[in-house]
Amino acid sequence: LRRSRGLGDVYKRQIKKRVPRNASALWNLGARAFTVLFHDGRLAIADDFDNGFNSPAEEWLPHGLETVLGTQAIFPMTAQFEMAGNPKENEVAGALHDRIDAVWPILAKRVRVIPEYGDMFVETFDDVDSAADVTISHIGEALAAFIALEFRSSDAPFDDFIAGDMSALTENQQRGAALFYGKAGCSDCHSGPLLTDQKFHALAIPPFGPGRTRRFDPYTRDVGRMGETDALEDAYRFRTPSLRNVALTAPYGHNGAYPTLEGIIRHHLDPIGSLDRWTPEMANLPHVPWLEAIDFVVWDDRFEMDRLRRRVDIQPRELDDAEVAALVDFMHALTGHSARDLPLGIPDTVPSGLPVDK
């Protein structure tokens, strides 16, 4: 995809649909503890299809993928409104219409015919003797290696505090930490070194946008984990995100419903009340007039909204404004010292010669 897909005025005129969900953060996804990815967990280390993973590609997942992160990296390429494009727009979109695994050979060829890329794959992978050997699995694992290195983060002030530096957190941040692990109940789900239990919970996050509808869904909605498991008890549940560098990953919620940490914290304290007080302006969507009429159509479906309200896994809690502010302050203490100074950064040029978005 070229620069013309950037969010300029020309592109806005081309927008036909919103992306259903907020992009997940990349921080620490190379950690072995991550075994399930995507908001609905549709990718996981498993052996359902004799290829090591339970994924949207099912038995058509390419051979040679070794990590869950490398496997995840090849799926945005197949998403129509992320990278694949619209029907009849290009050969990738056309191939996707036939079957998902028809996309990857096309993309792998585009990469390996660029001499510099081909040479780098030969140098990096033991089983690649020439550029012709490069497959989408090599590309996925190369992307995973980059993400694992570039977005590793374990040097936050909170890490220093745990290691014994009592001055690493301010008094208010320490107060927030005490609330996080105590009265506020945050650590019930945001636990462990990565601050996630990797499980799925229903929070009644305000719905909007196109949803992630299944073929038989008669209306716009996003049922979360249930879309993967078909289990009614998983309705509207979404994966607990890691809170590492959370202050850098706004907006919050699986669909980006809240633009601030305070907003998403207050929602956790009173899910139904926050749902009822939420306004469309909080979504902070790019202004696209011809989509705005349907962006919030799900709110007109009282049956769907009632189902959403009935499925909440957490209990309301009461915190005063000072306690909420302390929690927000503590969230900032989870930002790594080096999080804004990544090891590799954005290159000046890339082998394809395409413009680099700075």
Feature locations, PLM:
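Active-site-proximal structural scaffolding
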Residues: 19, 62, 136, 169, ...
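Periplasmic c-type cytochrome electron-transfer domains
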Residues: 13-125, 129-148, 247, 254-263, ...
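The canonical Cys-X-X-Cys-His
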Residues: 4-5, 26, 69, 143, ...
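Detector for the c-type heme attachment site
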Residues: 31, 189-195, 248
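An acidic, gly/pro-interrupted, aromatic-rich
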Residues: 43-71, 202-293
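Post-cleavage N-terminal segment of exported redox proteins
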Residues: 80, 95-174, 178, 191-199, ...
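Single conserved hydrophobic/aromatic residue that forms the stacking wall/gate
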Residues: 1-7, 11
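Extracellular low-complexity, Gly/Ser/Thr-rich intrinsically disordered linkers
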Residues: 245, 251-271, 275-348
